[in-house]
A protein has these predicted regions:
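Short Gly/Thr/Asp-enriched flexible loops that form oxyanion-binding sites at enzyme active sites
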Residues: 66-72, 163-176, 522-538
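ATP/nucleoside-binding phosphotransfer catalytic cores, i.e., glycine-rich phosphate-binding loops
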Residues: 2, 210, 216-311
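Glycine-rich N-terminal segment of FAD-binding domains in flavoprotein oxidoreductases
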Residues: 47-78
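Class I SAM-dependent methyltransferase SAM-binding "motif I" and its flanking Rossmann-like core
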Residues: 161, 165-209
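A conserved mid-domain beta-alpha-beta active-site/ligand-binding segment of alpha/beta enzyme cores
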Residues: 558-614
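Active-site beta-strand->loop->alpha-helix modules in alpha/beta enzyme cores, enriched
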Residues: 294-371, 375-546, 580-585, 599-604, ...
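N-terminal glycine-/serine-/threonine-rich phosphate-binding loop
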Residues: 1-54, 350-351, 358
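Ligand-binding beta-strand-loop-alpha-helix segment within the catalytic cores
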Residues: 7-21, 79-153, 279
Length: 637
């Protein structure tokens, strides 16, 4: 299929889509996919034969790339919006238009303020109405859509409850614009935007399922690992009002545009051998044998020819060899990932080890997007590297200041006040900052953020001291892109790249460790990783980079699949406790976490259970039984 063509195609027409009920296309690059969607919208606007081209618009992080490209098309390619009318899907009830969390604010920030769309052609549900006014208003919203001939192109996102718009589980297929009570999961997902669940509205005004299905063309965006399960259910399972997005199966011109992580749970990607004939790459063979071991509930070396045949893997045996040979090969592949020497074991044959033996003492640079990602993700490995004599450096890429609660900041200010009783200038300054915290709802003032950043920095130093890591080998980069004081960050600038490149140039590491978990709900990990990738691409011409290997870890948000793991560092029970204690030095992140995501467990609990699960998976596959395992994947540049 031409990936540049988003034209609707009936699902199920070929073997690869036979389990699917909604047309979908997967892209490796979100920016590329967003640009193609924006181009389809632009073509619709330019080719519109009626007076107006009517757009249905969504909010949230998913469509931001599309809006960014539409702005570019307007400014650089003269795309005009004078013949466009827009209708937004929804709005929180009880928010004023000017509220920073309103969808009015969102749309003006990301699109409307940057294009020539007349203000009287913009329609967004009004969340500031009284409850008595809502019913009549919703009917008028529907009538207004109909008066323009209906929606030509509807852009959608999808929530964890499979809601589209704010159509929560239980919504009727024929529902129209109305007020709805928000599902607890939906409110939980919005909690970080509102600085706490208590401040999230309980109701919203939303276009109905029927309103959405009346659109002539629908495109739904799905980005990221956290959307994979609900997207697979929506695309492959039966229609049910328990999962409202499944109603889109009834639409004659609906396409889902996904990235690789969001489409990972679709049968054609998760178990392609059950869908069609496979091109058996090494990674796919690993994936299939791990899956078979789980299905058959047997360790790898006990899998039989019958197991392969009964679970749809006869083609693997036919093309790759006898089960006995496959089992031995896979067992060795896994065994060779395990090492207690993450920096390489000196004076040994390293042919079957994940890391080189030379040089025996390496310079190691660990990049940590937030100030605690290093110990959460690889605290046990850091301890091993230090104990085995390597020169370990940790670079904290961002200050993490917005993740410190006001209460935590006040506590440190009060400690400081009690330490400077005779210094009136300092006391006056601290009193002023305390007043700022008490009076300002969002606390984005530079002085407040500076103190919160200092809290995070002191915690890093304490954790490093516990691991016997010299403070001089801790590098606080404070990358400027992060310093907005808000969840939404700036795009990386030349300064961000320069700071990162200068540090790598200075240390000239033999190993770099970086966060490869792109499921971080606020995108900081992805931005930090992209900065590193860009810098590595620029630096690879330098001689010292020939001796540098890059390893990606995953932290509190996501784990590596077994078939992707290339280095597995086992932890003993004592090392698990050592790692836990290192994490607990980050006290500001222990109890009241500002941006916890959708997992309510504390970070140290998540990390511990994730490492234990990886060890259990290895053991189930026939490897030795360990208390925990930290896993890494090599990045080739």
């Amino acid at each position: 299929m031409n990936q540049n063509n988003l034209t609707f195609q009936l699902p199920g027409r070929n073997e690869s889509t036979r389990f699917e009920k909604i047309h979908n296309i997967t892209y490796d690059n979100v920016a590329e996919a967003s640009a193609l969607i924006a181009q389809e919208i632009a073509n619709g606007i330019r080719n519109c034969k009626s007076e107006f081209y009517v757009l249905g618009l969504a909010t949230g992080s998913s469509p931001i790339g599309v809006y960014k490209e539409l702005v570019r098309l307007h400014k650089e390619e003269n795309l005009t919006f004078k013949n466009v009318v827009t209708f937004n899907l929804d709005e929180y009830f009880g928010l004023k238009i000017e509220d920073k969390n309103s969808y009015h604010s969102f749309m003006h920030t990301h699109l409307f303020d940057h294009i020539n769309l007349p203000k009287d052609q913009i329609y967004i549900p009004d969340g500031s109405l009284s409850e008595k006014e809502v019913s009549a208003y919703c009917l008028s919203y529907e009538e207004k859509i109909e008066s323009f001939g209906g929606i030509d192109f509807q852009l959608l996102g999808i929530g964890r409850t499979a809601h589209i718009g704010f159509n929560e589980p239980g919504s009727h297929i024929n529902s129209i614009t109305r007020m709805i009570a928000l599902d607890p999961i939906t409110r939980e997902d919005a909690a970080s935007d509102f600085n706490g669940l208590n401040f999230v509205p309980t109701k919203a005004i939303t276009m109905g399922i029927g309103s959405i299905l009346n659109a002539k063309r629908i495109v739904l965006l799905g980005w990221g690992h956290k959307k994979a399960a609900v997207l697979a259910l929506t695309i492959e399972k039966e229609i049910t009002n328990t999962y409202p997005a499944t109603f889109l199966q009834n639409h004659p011109n609906c396409t889902f545009i996904l990235d690789a992580e969001a489409s990972a749970e679709l049968s054609k990607h998760k178990t392609p051998w059950l869908v069609k004939e496979c091109d058996w790459t090494e990674r796919l063979i690993k994936k299939a044998i791990v899956w078979l071991s789980n299905q058959a509930q047997k360790p790898i070396l006990k899998l039989t020819n019958r197991d392969y045949n009964e679970h749809g893997l006869s083609s693997l045996v036919a093309s790759q060899g006898l089960p006995y040979e496959l089992n031995i090969w896979m067992f060795n592949q896994l065994q060779h990932t395990i090492t207690g020497w993450p920096g390489g074991k000196p004076n040994t044959d390293d042919k079957n080890r994940p890391e080189r033996s030379d040089p025996a003492k390496k310079r190691v640079l660990i990049f940590s997007p937030h100030p605690d990602d290093d110990v959460i993700s690889m605290g046990g490995t850091i301890a091993r590297l230090i104990e085995q004599g390597h020169e370990v450096h940790v670079a904290y890429q961002t200050s993490g200041n917005i993740t410190v609660s006001d209460e935590e900041a006040l506590k440190f200010i009060e400690v400081a006040e009690n330490s400077f009783l005779k210094d009136k200038t300092t006391l006056d300054h601290l009193q002023s900052v305390k007043q700022d915290i008490n009076l300002n709802e969002n606390n984005l003032l530079k002085e407040v953020l500076s103190i919160k950043g200092a809290v995070r920095k002191s915690e890093c130093i304490a954790a490093g001291r516990f691991l016997k890591l010299p403070t001089k080998q801790l590098h606080f980069l404070n990358l400027p892109f992060y310093e907005t004081g808000k969840i939404i960050k700036n795009e990386p600038s030349a300064t961000d790249y320069k700071i990162t490149q200068e540090l790598i140039d200075k240390i000239q590491p033999h190993q770099i460790f970086a966060a490869g978990d792109l499921a971080d709900p606020h995108g900081t990990h992805k931005t930090c990783l992209n900065i590193i990738f860009k810098v590595l691409d620029d630096l690879k011409v330098k001689k010292y980079m020939d001796a540098c290997r890059v390893w990606l870890y995953r932290s509190a948000w996501q784990a590596w699949d077994i078939e992707d793991i290339e280095m597995a560092v086992p932890l003993s029970p004592d090392q698990v406790i050592q790692k836990r204690n290192a994490i607990l030095f980050h006290q500001s992140q222990k109890d009241k976490v500002m941006f916890q995501g959708k997992d309510n467990r504390e970070f140290w609990v998540r990390a511990e259970q994730r490492n234990q699960t990886t060890a259990e998976l290895y053991n189930h596959l026939g490897m030795a039984e360990y208390a925990a395992i930290e896993a890494f994947k090599q990045y080739l540049f």
